[in-house]
Amino acid sequence: YKRQALPSGQALLILIPSVLYTVRPGDTLSSISSKFAIPQLTLLQNNPSLINSPYLQVGQTIVIAFEEEKQRRITVNGYAYPYIREDILRRALPYLTYLTIFGYGFTPDGALIPINDEPLIRMAYEYRTAPVMLLSSVTEDGNFSGERASLLFQNQALQETVMDNILALMHKKGYVGLDVDFEYVEQKDATAFLGFLEYTASRLHAEGFFLHTDLAPKTSAAQAGLLYEAHN
């Protein structure tokens, strides 16, 4: 590792192992998991070096538990593009509740703009992480479009077509929920945007899915800027 100066005031987490195990001939993650009655995922979380090196070495020491662990349940979401490096994604997945994959756009006639998401979905399930579909106003050229978003918000028939296609794809690919990420929404579309979210939520909830929506951070209702004004 390259030596890097730590910034003053940075907090460091120091965990002290309370239970260690030395790998013996024939051991696997599954057998060690059974021996200590802990999930394999916990072994990966306690030993990040195992995530990209799944083969155990005889004599290798692994951490079973740490001293004075403060455990509580939290929900963690991570975003990833389909072209993310596999080794980076694998290091993150053991710590994620949801993996939101960026992202589907839609055409003016309601067809979804496809992405290569299936490898990430399979990997998410491998680590018991729930994959979340993302819908945005990204067009065929890869840019966010306020005009494309407005077209959707103001056209109920288009909303129905887009949602029909989304639900069919979610069932097919194994998504558990939908994340809506619309940037550069114009102020004139603020009310219609909320109406779209209400309609989307009702369609999703009726079929057992959830809805997340991404909002720009606002410090006041009067905050100016195209990223903020339409977000209530």
Mark where each language-model region is.
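Chitinase-like catalytic core of GlcNAc-active glycosidases
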Residues: 68-82, 93, 107-232
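Long, low-complexity intrinsically disordered regions
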Residues: 83-86, 92, 96, 100-105
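Boundary/entry segment of secreted carbohydrate-active catalytic domains
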Residues: 18-21, 60-88
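Conserved residues at the C-terminal ends of beta-strands
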Residues: 15, 102, 181-183
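Short, well-ordered loop/turn sites that connect or cap secondary structure elements
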Residues: 6-7, 56
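Conserved small/polar residues in nucleotide/adenosyl-binding loops
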Residues: 1-4
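Primarily a LysM-type cell-wall glycan-binding module
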Residues: 10-39, 60
